Structures are given as C-alpha cells and as structure tokens.
UniProtKB/Swiss-Prot annotation:
Residue ranges annotated for the Fibronectin type-III domain, each copy included: 405-502
Lineage, uppermost ranks: Eukaryota, Metazoa, Chordata, Craniata, Vertebrata
Location in or out of the cell: Membrane
SMART domains assigned: FN3 (SM00060), IG (SM00409), IGc2 (SM00408), LRR_TYP (SM00369), LRRCT (SM00082)
Entry-annotated residues carrying Phosphoserine: 585, 627
LRR repeat segments: 49-70, 73-94, 97-118, 121-142, 146-169, 170-191, 194-215
Domain LRRCT residue range list: 234-280
Protein name: Leucine-rich repeat and fibronectin type-III domain-containing protein 4
Domain Ig-like, first and last residues per copy: 281-367
Membrane-topology descriptor: Single-pass membrane protein
Organism: Rattus norvegicus (Rat)
Record text about domains: The PDZ-binding motif is required for neurite outgrowth promotion and interaction with DLG1, DLG3- and DLG4.
Positions annotated as glycosylated: 25, 333
Gene: Lrfn4
Length: 636
C-alpha cells in the first residue's frame, strides 16, 4: 500500500495539469506541453510553477494579464503559429524570469509601448511572420540591456524603434529582412559592438549611409567580432553615395544594382569604382518674380535636378533659413508657401538645392503690395498716402489739387448687374505698377477690391446688386521712393453710380408663350372634333348599309294531293330598279367607288392634319371649315 503522502502528491500533480495538455516533471523543472491541442485561449489551470510553457499551433486569439499571472518562474514561452491579434497591456508583467518569447506566425498588426512590459531579463524575442506595421518606440525598453536576438522579419514595417535597437549592447543577431524599410538612420548600429549577424534582405533600401559596423565584415580575421551582413534584394542606387560600400570588396555577396539605368542589373561588386558617380544639382525652373497683395497667399516654386535627388532649402530676405511655422511651409519638393503675406515678407528669397555632388541656388523676388489703410497720408511730394474708400471720397469732395490734374473716373453702360469703369492715361512721369478699384454698395458695406493691369484704361464690374447705390474709387499703385518704404498709393478719382432695378424679363416671354399655347390648344380641339365627326359618319354609314341588305329568294315547289306538278319554267332574273345616283354608297352594294373615295378622304385628312397649325393662324381656319361642310354634304 502506497504511503498517503505520495498519493497526495500524485493527486495534486494530476490536478495541476490542464486536461488537453501533457505535463512533464523533469528533475526540478516543470514543462507544460499544449501544442496542437485546438486551444482557443490559454488554459486557466496551468501550474504557476511551470518553467516551460508551449502553446504553439493552436487558435489563441488574444492575450491578457490573467493568462500568465504569478508565473514568476517561467523561462520559455512559445506562442508560435496561433491567431493572436491583440496583446493586452502588461500581459507578461509577472514573467520576470522569462528568457525566450516566441510570437512568430501570428496576426499581430501593432505593438504598443506596454504590450511587452515585464520580462526584464528577456534574451530572445521572435516576432517574425506577423502583419506588424508599427512598433511603438518604447516597446523594447524593459529588456534593452539583456536582449541578444531580435527577429522582426517578414512583416510590413517601414520603421522600427531605431533608438531602442541602437541601445542594445548585448545584441548578437538582428533580422530585419523582408520588410518595407527604405532608409537607415546614419550611425544607428555604431554602439552594437556584439552584433555578429545583420540581415537586411528584401527591403526597399536604395542607399546605405556609412557606418563603422559594415567595415567589420571586410576582414573577419582582424575583427574581434566579424559581421555577417546581407542586404541583397534591395533596389540599390549605385552612385557616389554607395562608393564607400563598394570599396569594402565583399565577394561573397550577390547584390545587384537597380539604378541608374546604365548600371541596372549589373553585379554590385563588379562595377568599377569610377562608375559610382553623382550629378550636381541643377535648378530646372523656379519663380523669378511674384507680386501679391498684402494678406494674400504667396507660393514660391523651385525645381531642381540631380543625382541623387537634391535636398531643397529656402533662405529668407534676412539671410535666415526658412522653416515650417504657422505662417510658412517649406515642402520637400522645393515649394515655399506663405499663408498670409505682410510687408515684412517682401524681398529676395534664395532657393538652395544640395546633394553630395554640390549645390545650386536661385533668386526669387517677392513683392508685397500694401493695401490702403485708413488715416495714413504721405506728405512727400504732395501725394496722398494709402487711404480707404471713405477717406478717398472725402478727399475728392474737398477738391485737393492733385485730383484736378488727374483724369476723371467714369462709370458707364450701367445695367442691373454690371458697369464699365473708364479712366484716362495718367501722368507719364509717374510709373504705375497697377490700378486698384475699390467699391461698395448701399446693400452691403463690405469693401471690394479689384486689381487691374497698368496697361488697362477700363474695367467691367460684374455681379453687382440690382437697384443699389455704389461708391467707387480708383487708385494707382506706384513704386515706393525708398527700398524700405511701402508701396505708394495715389488716388485718381471717385464716382457714384446706381445700378438699374431688376426688370422682370418674363412678361414679353409670357405673352409669347401664352399665344403659342393657345394656338396649340385650339388646334388640338379642332383636330379632336374632326376626328370624332369623321368616325361618327363612318359608323352611321356602315349601319345604314347593313339595314338594306338584299334578300335572295330561292325557287319553291309545292306538292298538293300527292301529285306532282310540272316544274315551272325558269325565267331570267329581273334587273333591280335603278337607284338614285349618289357620290358614294355605304351599303353592301357596289363598293368600288367607296374605296376610291375613302382613299381620297384619307389623303385629304392627312394633308389637313399636317397643316392644322398653319391653318389656325390665317385663312387655313376658314378653309378647314369649308372642307368640313363639303365632307358632310358628300357623306350624308
């Protein structure tokens, strides 16, 4: 008989193992093997003393903190090839002894900053074969000092936590292959002195920045920790930026060039160093001069060519680099936008295009035309300064001397919604950049501006309010006297006009439409009446003909007293009495003439129906009446 203590231990051990799993108690370690068991979640009754837990090849969809709570002795956790789409925050929070975590072959799309919190002694992290598109910058912070192997291959990553990866001094193997990575930060691997394998295969890398890490693989015997580097399957752009890599002379790799076209498809290490060349930047087109009104958006464009693609910068009039701000935006393609221009934005801007082969510059002139502001006058030269429309009208009313020599402003050809503004040529001694028309109406006090080229002497105002009074002033914008002055504004004249009231254009059209409608209606009534009358006559004639059907008599023989009487002689049939002559007979007699008359009647009716609308407007109506009478006489 077994001792009671041994039976108790066996019973407790059997109860601790989940039913679908296999538990192995090898020496002091306990392994729980639950692979290929069809599990939908982590078994809740797993022994908390488990050292190795294998849950691979199941259908687990999510992980949460209760799944591994109090499993402080767990060293190896395998969750490969499940259907995990979500890892809750601090799901591994109690796994302080965990050394190996396998999450490959799942459906993870994102790793948050707290998804992997807890395993501070983690050494091997396998995340390959998921659908990861983003890994939070702080996702690896708990095991930066201990991690030795990191595998994030076969995902959809464009970026990885480079700052965290660059701070892993114990990292030996880094697999980044088969992702969408298109750039490596310069010097990102400088601190990885223990790195022995770096796999960058099948990404989107067109170039690689120089890094001391790559030179360790050139001489494996001299390097304390030789590097196995693989970056084949990338669209390498073989120009001067990769000349440093070409000089490493690694004959064991099979990389090829994807561009430029002259080197596409050639073996990378077989291309002579002299063919790894670059082209200096060349400004292809740019804005030369731009004039905008104060407050408008200004767009300065600059396009450059070169190999590699030049980096674009802008320098403002104050010789400072123009960066993105709340008012200005510098785009990578060389476009500079200023949202709301002011007088201080005017000046010369410099577009700078740079690449490793050199730089190119272009000058762009921005002129900001200041709008008139109320209360500002210029005493120099006797010219009025910037002024709004109220001040301009007041100045015109006071009769300043400057207006007497200026041409008058006239508004002619005024309609309900438009008016033609005309003015004469200005004084030849005064250069004019452009004219500015200011106007507002009694219906809306909003001041409206219109800019007219200096070569014009008239302007058509459109979209005016019907029946409204307008005040209009014309100003000339001229160059300032000094480089630091604002644009000079000179008043040419003012005018007052009123638009015509809105005229209902539908009266004449209404009479015309009503006349046409009445004609069509009367014609329709007459046509309908003629149709009804004709059908009635045809029906009446057919009924009369059926009543006069001739009776056909057969010969009758009579037999009396059983005797037979001789057959009477046959007499020739008597001809029917003559009938009165008619134009047409509708009985069942001779119908040949009726058919001809019907054809004539149908043709006349077709001709008359085609000309009914014309007959309604003239003698046709009278002709139609006469035809109807003749038709009645011929049928009845």
């Amino acid at each position: 008989m077994a001792p009671p203590l041994l039976l108790l231990l066996l019973a407790s051990g059997a109860a601790a193992c989940p039913l679908p799993c296999v538990c192995q108690n090898l020496s002091e370690s306990l392994s729980t093997l639950c692979a290929h068991r069809g599990l939908l979640f982590v078994p809740p009754n797993v022994d908390r003393r488990t050292v190795e837990l294998r849950l691979a090849d199941n259908f687990i969809q999510a992980l949460g903190p209760p799944d591994f709570r109090n499993m402080t002795g767990l060293v190896d956790l395998t969750l490969s090839r499940n259907a995990i789409t979500r890892i809750g925050a601090r799901s591994f929070g109690d796994l302080e002894s965990l050394r190996s975590l396998h999450l490959d072959g799942n459906r993870l799309v994102e790793l948050g900053s707290s998804s992997l919190r807890g395993p501070v002694n983690l050494q091997h992290l396998i995340l390959s074969g998921n659908q990861l598109g983003r890994i939070a910058p702080g996702a690896f912070d708990d095991f930066l000092d201990s991690l030795e192997d990191l595998d994030v291959s076969y995902n959809n990553l464009r970026q990885v936590p480079w700052a965290g990866i660059g701070s892993m001094p114990a990292l030996h193997t880094l697999n980044l292959d088969h992702n969408l990575i298109d750039a490596l930060p310069p010097g990102v691997f400088a601190q990885l002195s223990q790195l022995s394998r770096l796999d960058l295969t099948s990404n989107r890398l067109a170039t690689l920045a120089p890094d001391p890490l790559f030179s360790r693989g050139r001489d494996a015997e001299a390097s304390p920790s030789p590097l196995v580097l693989s970056f084949s399957g990338n669209p390498l752009h073989c120009n001067c930026e990769l000349l440093w890599l070409r000089r490493l002379a690694r004959p064991d790799d099979l990389e090829t060039c994807a561009s430029p076209p002259t080197l596409a498809g050639r073996y990378f290490w077989a291309v002579p160093e002299g063919e790894f060349s670059c082209e200096p930047p060349l400004i292809a087109r740019h804005t030369q001069r731009l004039w905008v009104l104060e407050g408008q958006r200004a767009t300065l464009r600059c396009r450059a060519l070169g190999d590699p693609v030049p980096t674009m910068h802008w320098v403002g009039p104050d010789d400072r680099l123009v960066g993105n701000s709340s008012r200005a935006w510098a785009f990578p393609n060389g476009t500079l936008e200023i949202g709301v221009t002011g007088a201080g934005d005017a000046g010369a801007y410099t577009c700078i295009a740079t690449n490793p082969a050199g730089e190119a510059t272009a000058r762009v002139e921005l002129r900001v035309l200041a709008l008139p502001h109320g209360g500002n006058t210029s005493a120099e030269g006797g010219r009025p300064g910037p002024s709004d429309i109220a001040a301009s009208a007041r100045t015109a009313a006071e009769g300043e001397g400057t207006l007497e020599s200026e041409p008058a402003v006239q508004v002619t050809e005024v309609t309900a919604t438009s008016g033609l503004v005309s003015w004469g040529p200005g004084r030849p001694a005064d250069p004019v950049w452009m004219f500015q028309i200011q106007y507002n109406s009694s219906e809306d006090e909003t001041l409206i501006y219109r800019i007219v080229p200096a070569s014009s002497q008239h302007f058509l105002l459109k979209h005016l309010v019907p029946g409204a009074d307008y005040d209009l002033c014309l100003l000339a914008l001229s160059p300032a006297a000094g480089p630091s002055d604002l644009t000079a504004t000179r008043l040419l004249g003012c005018a007052h006009f009123s638009t015509l009231p809105a005229t209902p254009l539908c009266h004449a059209l209404q009479a015309h439409v009503l006349g046409g409608t009445l004609t069509v209606a009367v014609g329709g009534v007459l046509v309908a009446a003629l149709l009804v009358f004709t059908v009635a006559l045809l029906v009446r004639g057919r009924g009369a003909g059926n009543g006069r059907l001739p009776l056909k008599l057969s010969h009758v023989q009579s037999q009396t007293n059983g005797g037979t009487s001789p057959m009477p002689k046959s007499h020739p049939p008597r001809s029917p009495p003559p009938r009165p002559q008619r134009s047409c007979s509708l009985d069942l007699g001779d119908t040949g003439g009726c058919y001809g008359y019907a054809r004539r009647l149908g043709g006349a009716w077709a001709r008359r129906s085609h000309s009914v609308h014309g007959g309604l407007l003239g003698a046709g109506c009278r002709g139609m009446g006469g035809s109807a009478e003749r038709l009645e006489e011929s049928v009845v």
